[in-house]
Amino acid sequence: MLKGKFIVIEGIEGSGKTTICKTLKNILYEHGIKNVICVRDPGSTPLAEKIRSLLITKDKNEYMVNETELLLFYAARIQLIKNIIQPALNKGVWVISDRYFLSSLAYQCAGRKIKEEIVLLLQSLFLKNFNPNITFYLDVTPEIGLNRIKNRNEIDRIEQNTKFFFNNVRNKYLNLIKTKPGIIKINANRKIDKVKHSCKQQMLSWLNTENL
């Protein structure tokens, strides 16, 4: 049995995932859980970061096939899980991840129209249905989310998708909440301080329920 806990933050672009990852880490620290790391999917290992660069950088000379995108995401995810997350959990370290498995169901299935059974098969084959202890889904409308990121220095390949694409992704997330356990929905359309407060309340409630 894993000694640490695996926490995941999900949501579309502009939902505040990176900020909330740091917030949850601070909440755990204040609660006395001080051995915590934050990672990002894809990324957080040397090889996974190289794959991440391929995924978010648009190549003017070649279109990335949707199936290629999916397999690259899984290649990076396997590196992250096998080399960082599982070893950390086995040592009693808590891990907070910016994205995980639900992102593939939302982005590649709803966004890219890849059959869901393909993603489920990849997850089963390579990660043995390795699941988080709890997932925070930051729900934001594409209008608000995309407006938040428009002032960034550079919009990456994923962020360049249409509002229609992100509506499909968001709707998939909302459907997943209804069918999968352990997902907490947070209204991320609000100002970040209110989002942080809601996440803190939910995290403390979960810790209390789990007697942690």
Curated annotation (Swiss-Prot):
What molecular function does GO assign, one term?
dTMP kinase activity
EC number, UniProt record = 2.7.4.9
Keyword terms of this UniProt record: ATP-binding, Kinase, Nucleotide biosynthesis, Nucleotide-binding, Transferase
Q: Report the top EC class in one word.
A: transferase
This enzyme catalyses: dTMP + ATP = dTDP + ADP
Q: Which residues are noted in the entry as ATP-binding? A: G11, I12, E13, G14, S15, G16, K17, T18
Task: Outline what the protein does.
Answer: Phosphorylation of dTMP to form dTDP in both de novo and salvage pathways of dTTP synthesis.
Which HAMAP family does the UniProt record give?
Thymidylate_kinase (MF_00165)
Q: Which family does it belong to?
A: Belongs to the thymidylate kinase family.
- Name the NCBIfam families on file: DTMP_kinase
Q: How is this protein named in the record?
A: Thymidylate kinase
- State the gene name recorded for this protein: tmk
